[in-house]
């Protein structure tokens, strides 16, 4: 079987969705900038040799509609012969895009692909135009459509306290701020044009969403959002709303060698799994178990983990389920996570994978795991290996 490698990966800074730096920047422009950026950073790759572009996006309407993968590629000046398709597995869309590209290369359907994703949650709200079939209530708990309520249920099921959630939320901001100050995000962030609070055009080089002043004590003062009477999940322990994109250059190891490119990681294994929609946030556990089995390794063999922080109330049960709860400080989300950086739905899978790859290099780690929950009860996971 062919080895599939990632030779480069970048992301935009994460912009705040409400009046943020990308309020005048469209989702296609965020995407196109990264597509162009990958090619500029890797001149050994002839754009004509790109087979296809797999691009994750959840809310495929308004500026994100009508196949944003193709639209963005045309804006980026990618040759017309290169195809593009938009992928939707909700929160796992851009990781699914990576999986699709990987499988295509394995099957001999091309040698070089781009995979990534975007979500501009400021321009296209998460719930825009959603109309669930009423018949779903016969087989799925009504609250399954509320991600926050599923997190509440999961926290109760696993005995996660409000205090633990507040500390986890504060940790995310603290570690993301440290990563910013120490320059650890610099290698993965691709600078973008945006607008400051006064409307002036500026070059954006850092994430806008991180709140370095956040403390567990401060978070403890916030009221529960989804279950005001009995809940524990607050806005401060939920993933922030943000705008962003991430992109990866994926190819066969043989092609990378032919072009003289140095692979950063190879795809060791991939998996998706379903779970009860009422505890949708637990999806990373069965997905990771599948991926580990396919890679022939155990969770103890994994050196670094990126778990998408949809909610603290969701992340902590997953860490318990994966036996990582007591290894959090040494392995998990060492540069913070989505509570601090935000969760632009179609972008996040490629974003956490990009952050993971950079962490693996920084830590000289051999194996890394990126995994995330998916609305309505799914999980997705990828095991990466340094080469």
Swiss-Prot record:
A GO molecular-function descriptor? acetyl-CoA C-acyltransferase activity
Q: Known Gene3D superfamilies for this protein?
A: 3.40.47.10
Q: Which CDD domains does the UniProt record give?
A: thiolase (cd00751)
Q: What is its main location?
A: cytoplasm
Give the EC class as a word.
transferase
**Catalytic site residues?**
91 (acyl-thioester intermediate), 343 (proton acceptor), 373 (proton acceptor)
Q: Name one GO biological process term.
A: fatty acid beta-oxidation
Q: Please give the start and end residues of each transmembrane region.
A: none
E.C. number(s) listed in UniProt: 2.3.1.16
Q: Which UniProt keywords apply?
A: Acyltransferase, Cytoplasm, Fatty acid metabolism, Lipid degradation, Lipid metabolism, Transferase
One Pfam match, given by its short name, reads Thiolase_N
Gene Ontology CC annotations of this record: cytoplasm
Which InterPro entries does this entry report, sorted A to Z? FadA (IPR012805), Thiolase (IPR002155), Thiolase-like (IPR016039), Thiolase-like_sf_Thiolase (IPR050215), Thiolase_acyl_enz_int_AS (IPR020615), Thiolase_AS (IPR020610), Thiolase_C (IPR020617), Thiolase_CS (IPR020613)
Catalytic reactions on record: an acyl-CoA + acetyl-CoA = a 3-oxoacyl-CoA + CoA
Location comes to: Cytoplasm
What the entry lists under PROSITE patterns is as follows: THIOLASE_1, THIOLASE_2, THIOLASE_3
Tell me the pathway.
Lipid metabolism; fatty acid beta-oxidation
Give the quaternary structure.
Heterotetramer of two alpha chains (FadB) and two beta chains (FadA).
Function, as annotated, reads: Catalyzes the final step of fatty acid oxidation in which acetyl-CoA is released and the CoA ester of a fatty acid two carbons shorter is formed.
Question: What family classification does the UniProt entry report for this protein?
Answer: Belongs to the thiolase-like superfamily. Thiolase family.
Tell me the protein's name: 3-ketoacyl-CoA thiolase
Name of the encoding gene: fadA
């Amino acid at each position: 079987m062919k080895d599939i490698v990632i030779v480069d990966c970048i992301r935009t800074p994460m912009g705040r969705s409400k009046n943020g730096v990308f309020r005048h920047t469209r989702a296609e422009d965020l995407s196109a900038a990264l597509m162009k950026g990958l090619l500029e950073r890797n001149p050994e790759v002839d754009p004509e040799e790109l087979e296809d572009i797999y691009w994750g996006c959840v809310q495929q309407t308004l500026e994100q509609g009508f196949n944003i993968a193709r639209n963005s590629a045309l804006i980026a000046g990618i040759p017309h012969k290169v195809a593009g398709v938009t992928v939707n597995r909700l929160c796992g869309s851009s990781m699914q895009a990576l999986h699709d590209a990987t499988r295509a290369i394995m099957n001999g359907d091309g040698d070089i692909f781009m995979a990534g994703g975007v979500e501009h949650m400021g321009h296209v709200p998460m719930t825009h135009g959603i109309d669930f079939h009423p018949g779903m209530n016969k087989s799925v708990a009504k609250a399954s459509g509320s991600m926050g309520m599923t997190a509440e249920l999961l926290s109760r099921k696993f005995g996660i306290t409000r205090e633990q959630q507040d500390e986890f939320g504060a940790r995310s901001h603290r570690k993301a701020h440290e990563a910013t100050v120490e320059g650890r995000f610099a290698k993965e962030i691709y600078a973008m044009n945006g607008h400051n609070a006064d409307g002036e055009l500026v070059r954006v080089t850092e994430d806008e969403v991180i709140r370095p002043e956040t403390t567990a004590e401060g978070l403890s003062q916030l009221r529960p959002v989804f279950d005001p009477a009995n809940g524990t999940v607050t806005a401060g322990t939920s993933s922030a709303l943000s705008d962003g994109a991430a992109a990866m250059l994926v190819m066969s190891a043989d092609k990378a060698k032919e072009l003289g490119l140095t692979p950063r990681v190879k795809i060791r294994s991939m998996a998706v799994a379903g779970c009860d929609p009422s505890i949708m946030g637990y999806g990373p556990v069965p997905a990771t178990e599948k991926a580990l089995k396919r890679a022939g390794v155990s969770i103890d063999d994994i050196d670094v983990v990126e778990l998408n922080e949809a909610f603290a109330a969701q992340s902590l049960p997953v860490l318990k389920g994966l036996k990582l709860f007591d290894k959090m400080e040494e392995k998990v989300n060492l540069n913070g996570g989505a509570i601090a950086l935000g969760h632009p739905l179609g972008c996040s899978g490629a974003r956490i994978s990009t952050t993971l790859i950079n962490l693996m290099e920084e830590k000289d780690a051999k194996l890394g795991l990126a995994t995330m929950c998916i609305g309505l009860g799914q999980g997705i996971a990828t095991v990466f290996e340094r080469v």
